[in-house]
Amino acid sequence: MTKGILGKKVGMTQIFTESGEFIPVTVIEATPNVVLQVKTVETDGYEAVQVGFDDKREVLSNKPAKGHVAKANTAPKRFIREFKNIEGLEVGAELSVEQFEAGDVVDVTGISKGKGFQGVIKRHGQSRGPMAHGSRYHRRPGSMGPVAPNRVFKNKRLAGRMGGNRVTVQNLEIVQVIPEKNVILVKGNVPGAKKSLITIKSAVKAAK
């Protein structure tokens, strides 16, 4: 069965194991998520569990949103997402960090940091031209392709907006779970800025 929870990225730090090994970790705060709706094949065409995370003031919610969360007897939520392959939960149930334990392998999803409009060197890692000796080619995109088509092909790597994409990092290891603080420590880095929404769920490609 899949495990899943929504959380907020706090930042990065480091811990040491008993053997003295140094491990960089990302701190993710995941206060209890509330099950708002259980979707079934009969009513919705597919099976999923809809959960809400991070309370917000009622004045910021409209009537339909208030009615939706009232069924779960909870406050309006800032973030609402779905998890599939989670069974045995009812509306109003809570998902906490205690479902995970050290050593679990998870997939972590977030929105990468936006970098704005960037050139091909920063955006795609293209090599630059000579910077001196009369060169007139420094940081330009280079060849646009052959002459014959009389056009630039789709997907040509050019300058443009960079970052701000939905990114999933697979097979990250949970180093430690701290239930009293609703915190999960994940080995390595995860996408997104501080305070951004993070989705943690069981890895789909984990070694069995």
From Swiss-Prot:
GO terms for cellular component: cytosolic large ribosomal subunit. Signal peptide: none annotated. One of its GO terms (biological process) is translation. Pfam families: Ribosomal_L3. Residues 122-148 are annotated as: Disordered. It comes from the Bacteria. GO terms for molecular function: rRNA binding; structural constituent of ribosome. Keywords: Ribonucleoprotein, Ribosomal protein, RNA-binding, rRNA-binding. One of the primary rRNA binding proteins, it binds directly near the 3'-end of the 23S rRNA, where it nucleates assembly of the 50S subunit. Belongs to the universal ribosomal protein uL3 family. Part of the 50S ribosomal subunit. Forms a cluster with proteins L14 and L19. HAMAP family: Ribosomal_uL3_B (MF_01325_B). This is Large ribosomal subunit protein uL3. It comes from Streptococcus pyogenes serotype M1. The lineage of its organism: Bacteria, Bacillati, Bacillota, Bacilli, Lactobacillales.
